[in-house]
């Protein structure tokens, strides 16, 4: 199968994007304490994630607590949870489909066309996963920036962009690149197969027995 390094690079990037998506979903550093104004000197750091919030005080170990009530969560947080969970599931499905489409795996036998379609499907799912990651990450970042510059919000309630958001953006970019490589591999493989013309087979010349018999009879009659 041609363009083999292309599919390997696409699957590796897809795997890295899946790991980054899972880490982004689980990490609590989506919203972190903002050290501005009179809040520059503080003795504690506050992290807020999709599933828990963590507080780290001076000379005290990190303390994390899961959100106790699902109904009390803001709609933006609930939507981000749902989208990130869907993204993790899609990335796992895309990776499994991509593995089935590899040259060494005999799930579809030696059918190169079927393998190319599997890799193309995997690439589309990776791109879709990147979109699902990009939406909640960018939405949360927009809310943080909007509240940060809102003078009506107290300084102690303002937050900054956490490391999980940057990891989410990086994961989405990796997923887009990996999915694009797999889709490109599928297109290149289809073009390659489109240039293959069937080789004409050798046909055994057909002889007409009746014609040969008639010719022989005429020849024998002429000699008589």
Swiss-Prot record:
<keyword id="KW-0407">Ion channel</keyword>
<feature type="topological domain" description="Extracellular">
    <location>
        <begin position="29"/>
        <end position="81"/>
    </location>
</feature>
<dbReference type="InterPro" id="IPR004031">
    <property type="entry name" value="PMP22/EMP/MP20/Claudin"/>
</dbReference>
<keyword id="KW-1133">Transmembrane helix</keyword>
<protein>
    <recommendedName>
        <fullName>Claudin-17</fullName>
    </recommendedName>
</protein>
<feature type="topological domain" description="Extracellular">
    <location>
        <begin position="146"/>
        <end position="164"/>
    </location>
</feature>
<feature type="transmembrane region" description="Helical">
    <location>
        <begin position="165"/>
        <end position="185"/>
    </location>
</feature>
<keyword id="KW-0813">Transport</keyword>
<feature type="transmembrane region" description="Helical">
    <location>
        <begin position="8"/>
        <end position="28"/>
    </location>
</feature>
<comment type="similarity">
    <text>Belongs to the claudin family.</text>
</comment>
<keyword id="KW-1003">Cell membrane</keyword>
<comment type="subunit">
    <text>Cannot form tight junction strands on its own. Interacts with OCLN.</text>
</comment>
<keyword id="KW-0406">Ion transport</keyword>
<dbReference type="GO" id="GO:0070160">
    <property type="term" value="C:tight junction"/>
</dbReference>
<feature type="transmembrane region" description="Helical">
    <location>
        <begin position="125"/>
        <end position="145"/>
    </location>
</feature>
<dbReference type="GO" id="GO:0034707">
    <property type="term" value="C:chloride channel complex"/>
</dbReference>
<dbReference type="GO" id="GO:0042802">
    <property type="term" value="F:identical protein binding"/>
</dbReference>
<dbReference type="InterPro" id="IPR017974">
    <property type="entry name" value="Claudin_CS"/>
</dbReference>
<keyword id="KW-0472">Membrane</keyword>
<feature type="topological domain" description="Cytoplasmic">
    <location>
        <begin position="186"/>
        <end position="224"/>
    </location>
</feature>
<comment type="function">
    <text>Channel-forming tight junction protein with selectivity for anions, including chloride and hydrogencarbonate, and for solutes smaller than 9 Angstrom in diameter. In the kidney proximal tubule, may be involved in paracellular reabsorption of filtered anions. Does not affect water permeability.</text>
</comment>
<dbReference type="GO" id="GO:0160187">
    <property type="term" value="F:paracellular tight junction channel activity"/>
</dbReference>
<keyword id="KW-0869">Chloride channel</keyword>
<dbReference type="InterPro" id="IPR006187">
    <property type="entry name" value="Claudin"/>
</dbReference>
<feature type="transmembrane region" description="Helical">
    <location>
        <begin position="82"/>
        <end position="102"/>
    </location>
</feature>
<dbReference type="Pfam" id="PF00822">
    <property type="entry name" value="PMP22_Claudin"/>
</dbReference>
<keyword id="KW-0868">Chloride</keyword>
<keyword id="KW-0965">Cell junction</keyword>
<dbReference type="GO" id="GO:0160184">
    <property type="term" value="P:paracellular transport"/>
</dbReference>
<keyword id="KW-0812">Transmembrane</keyword>
<dbReference type="GO" id="GO:0005254">
    <property type="term" value="F:chloride channel activity"/>
</dbReference>
<keyword id="KW-0796">Tight junction</keyword>
<feature type="topological domain" description="Cytoplasmic">
    <location>
        <begin position="1"/>
        <end position="7"/>
    </location>
</feature>
<dbReference type="GO" id="GO:0005923">
    <property type="term" value="C:bicellular tight junction"/>
</dbReference>
<dbReference type="GO" id="GO:0007155">
    <property type="term" value="P:cell adhesion"/>
</dbReference>
<dbReference type="GO" id="GO:0016338">
    <property type="term" value="P:calcium-independent cell-cell adhesion via plasma membrane cell-adhesion molecules"/>
</dbReference>
<dbReference type="GO" id="GO:0070830">
    <property type="term" value="P:bicellular tight junction assembly"/>
</dbReference>
<dbReference type="GO" id="GO:0005198">
    <property type="term" value="F:structural molecule activity"/>
</dbReference>
<feature type="topological domain" description="Cytoplasmic">
    <location>
        <begin position="103"/>
        <end position="124"/>
    </location>
</feature>
<dbReference type="GO" id="GO:0016323">
    <property type="term" value="C:basolateral plasma membrane"/>
</dbReference>
<dbReference type="GO" id="GO:0005886">
    <property type="term" value="C:plasma membrane"/>
</dbReference>
<dbReference type="GO" id="GO:0015267">
    <property type="term" value="F:channel activity"/>
</dbReference>
């Amino acid at each position: 199968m041609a363009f083999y390094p292309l599919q390997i690079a696409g699957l590796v990037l897809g795997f890295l994007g899946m790991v980054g998506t899972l880490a982004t979903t689980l990490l609590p550093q989506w919203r972190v304490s903002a050290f501005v104004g009179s809040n520059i000197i503080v003795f504690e750091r506050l992290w807020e994630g999709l599933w828990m919030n963590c507080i780290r005080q001076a000379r005290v170990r990190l303390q994390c607590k899961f959100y106790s009530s699902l109904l009390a969560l803001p709609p933006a947080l609930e939507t981000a949870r749902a989208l990130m969970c869907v993204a993790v599931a899609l990335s796992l499905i895309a990776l499994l489909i991509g593995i089935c489409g590899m040259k060494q795996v005999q799930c579809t036998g030696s059918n190169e066309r079927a393998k190319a379609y599997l890799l193309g499907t995997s690439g589309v799912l990776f791109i879709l996963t990147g979109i699902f990651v990009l939406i909640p990450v960018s939405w949360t970042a927009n809310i943080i920036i909007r509240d940060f510059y809102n003078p009506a919000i107290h300084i102690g309630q303002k937050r900054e962009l956490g490391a999980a958001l940057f990891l989410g953006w990086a994961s989405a970019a990796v997923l887009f690149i990996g999915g694009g490589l797999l889709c490109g591999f599928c297109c290149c493989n289809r073009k390659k197969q489109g240039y293959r013309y069937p080789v004409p087979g050798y046909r055994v010349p057909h002889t007409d027995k009746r014609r040969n018999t008639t010719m022989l009879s005429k020849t024998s009659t002429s000699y008589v």
